[in-house]
Amino acid sequence: MPYRKYREKKYETKYREAFKVFQEKIGITFTDEKLLIQAFTHSSYVNEHRKKPHEDNERLEFLGDAVLELTVSQYLFQKYPTMSEGELTKLRAAIVCEPSLVRFANELSFGGLVLLGKGEEMTGGRERPALLADVFEAFIGALYLDQGLETVWGFLKEIVYPKINEGAFSHVMDYKSQLQELIQRDGSGNIEYQILQEKGPAHNREFVSRVTLNNVALGLGSGKSKKEAEQQAAAEALKKLKEQL
């Protein structure tokens, strides 16, 4: 066997073993392993191995992007029944943005599995954020095609959703949503908002709101609208609760 073919066969055996270990790590075995390998195949690798039947991960990335948006949207819709469309959109955007996807990919050492061309490898492509984010989306696409939405949901439940529950993305929420998140995390009880006072002329109204947790006052706030007053009350409550932590 010519040395080059021997070297390529050895490399192929090595990455197939790596994918086997990866599947054991995540507790998922692909029915069609070709989909898994394709998810980690960068276009630069395909360009340098034209005689091999490899496909790059770009189409899977396209699909995975849509699947990820759908599943994260469904999770947020169920978890935050009172959150507005605008707030849900902001939170979803923070979860599926490039830095977040890179974080998820790095947690599972995706970079070490990517099949790269020599040029891309030499320029540090394995650690390039955009590449890692694309691979994560491609993996979601491959998982969806191989095993369906339920398995994708189970995977995200282990890797992505816990970070939402831990408050990793609360910085993009409004004060009321942040307060709700904090209370849900601690399992402390029910939050209620009350308008205590309305004052001033009709064209310049001021509202005073109080937020309570299990009938215990947490914060007061005022604003030009009921919504603004409630936000300010939630901000004060958040400040107090965080000081106690």
UniProtKB/Swiss-Prot annotation:
PANTHER family given in the database record: RIBONUCLEASE 3 (PTHR11207:SF0), RIBONUCLEASE III (PTHR11207)
Q: Where is the DRBM domain?
A: 174-243
| Annotated catalytic residues | 65, 137
**Subunit structure and binding partners:** Homodimer.
CDD domains linked to this entry: DSRM_RNAse_III_family, RIBOc
What species is given as this protein's source?
A: Bacillus cereus (strain ZK / E33L)
Q: PROSITE patterns attached here? A: DS_RBD, RNASE_3_1, RNASE_3_2
Function recorded in the entry: Digests double-stranded RNA. Involved in the processing of primary rRNA transcript to yield the immediate precursors to the large and small rRNAs (23S and 16S). Processes some mRNAs, and tRNAs when they are encoded in the rRNA operon. Processes pre-crRNA and tracrRNA of type II CRISPR loci if present in the organism.
Q: Where does Mg(2+) bind?
A: 61, 134, 137
Q: What is the gene name?
A: rnc
State the superkingdom.
Bacteria
The entry's cellular-component GO terms read: cytoplasm
Name of the molecule in the record: Ribonuclease 3
Name the Gene3D superfamilies on file. Answer: 3.30.160.20, Ribonuclease III domain
* EC number, UniProt record: 3.1.26.3
Instruction: Provide any one GO MF term from the record.
Output: metal ion binding
- Looking at the record, the residues that make up the RNase III domain are 19-148
